[in-house]
From Swiss-Prot:
Binds 1 FAD per subunit. This is Thioredoxin reductase NTRB. The active site is a redox-active disulfide bond. One of its GO terms (biological process) is removal of superoxide radicals. It comes from Oryza sativa subsp. japonica. One of its GO terms (cellular component) is cytoplasm. Homodimer. GO terms for molecular function: thioredoxin-disulfide reductase (NADPH) activity. Possesses thioredoxin-disulfide reductase activity. Its cofactor is FAD. Keywords: Disulfide bond, Electron transport, FAD, Flavoprotein, NADP, Oxidoreductase, Redox-active center, Transport. Pfam families: Pyr_redox_2.
Length: 331
């Protein structure tokens, strides 16, 4: 990393993000001697450096940790490994980019980096609802990832509730019936917006019951400050409030990809995720790559994010080799 006081820093690869995809990209790029610079952000999207995993307690589905590992600890280890191989980490949030010409410009409020290649790995934030008790029982029975947390012992053979009405809500509700005694779907409207086939699967499942025209107004715990014990559900038509004793509540109301800072410089899909070429991490701008949940709205797992971070680093390395070869021929 080059640069004098007040001058832009110069690097081969700049990585934007701090989750599994960003740090895996950094590890691979650093080992390839590309001397990556990584902007990890400062409470970017209101989440600490490390991404969504820092909001998770036990991670039990990441290979290599048979006893599980705390989400924050896993990301601390990823960060340490990035540093070990020579990644320069800047604890600032990227506010602007310029991908119109090489070198690409990536800037926070106080630091500018010029890079020959960029990896965008800023993730996506699960949408959360806020009501009485929603923050107090977050990660204590309330979650936004059924695949990540649904198999936890606290949910097994216990009633579970899901909020949502789209395909993800239907899919997660069916998934949770493998573990919970039964699942309540709570939806604000009297019809689902999910595809017909996904609706049919959920509505035909004997372990699923739907609360139409309803919303959760309160979450509460057991005696002695225990985890989630139930929720109060209000019918928006009648005003009646029902008390559901559940051990789990899952938000399935979508995710918000962190792409606003891009300023329209990369092609996005209809849901705001960075569009990548099939089978690669290449974006609409040559030399700019995307990895992790910022381009993945299907899997959204730590392990798949890490895998795509590896892909992005390898794609960036190959791109730089090609550019170098072309420039050599031009000389």
């Amino acid at each position: 990393m080059e640069g004098s006081a007040g001058a832009p820093l110069r690097t081969r690869v700049c990585i934007i993000g701090s989750g599994p995809s960003a740090h895996t990209a950094a590890i691979y790029a650093a080992r390839a001697e590309l001397k990556p610079v990584l902007f990890e952000g400062w409470l970017a999207n209101d989440i600490a450096a490390g991404g969504q995993l820092t909001t998770t307690t036990d991670v039990e589905n990441f290979p290599g940790f048979p006893e599980g590992i705390l989400g924050g600890e896993l990301m601390d280890r990823c960060r340490a490994q990035s540093l070990r191989f020579g990644t320069s980490i800047i604890s600032e949030t990227v506010t602007a980019v310029d991908f119109s010409a090489r070198p690409f410009r990536v800037a926070s409020d106080s630091t500018t980096v010029l890079a020959d290649a960029v990896v965008v790995a800023t993730g996506a934030v699960a949408r959360r609802l806020h009501f009485a008790g929603s923050d107090a029982y977050w990660n204590r029975g309330i979650s936004a990832c059924a695949v990540c947390d649904g198999a936890a012992p606290i949910f097994r053979n216990k009633p579970i509730a899901v909020i949502g009405g789209g395909d993800s809500a239907m899919e997660e509700s069916n998934f949770l019936t493998k573990y919970g005694s039964h699942v309540y779907i709570i939806h604000r409207r009297n019809t689902f917006r999910a595809s017909k086939i996904m609706q049919a699967r959920a509505l035909s499942n004997p372990k699923i019951q739907v609360f139409w025209d309803s919303e959760v107004v309160e979450a509460y715990g057991g005696e002695g400050g225990g985890p989630l014990a139930g929720v109060k559900v209000k019918n928006l038509v009648t005003g009646k409030i029902s008390d559901l004793q559940v051990s789990g509540l899952f938000f399935a109301i979508g995710h918000e990809p962190a792409t606003k800072f891009l300023g329209g410089q990369l092609e996005l899909d209809a849901d705001g995720y960075v569009a990548t070429k099939p089978g690669s991490t290449h974006t609409s701008v040559k030399g700019v790559f995307a990895a992790g949940d910022v381009q993945d709205k299907k899997y959204r797992q730590a392990i798949t994010a890490a895998g795509s971070g590896c892909m992005a680093a390898l794609d960036a390395e190959h791109y730089l080799q090609e550019v170098g070869a072309q420039e050599g021929k031009a000389d």
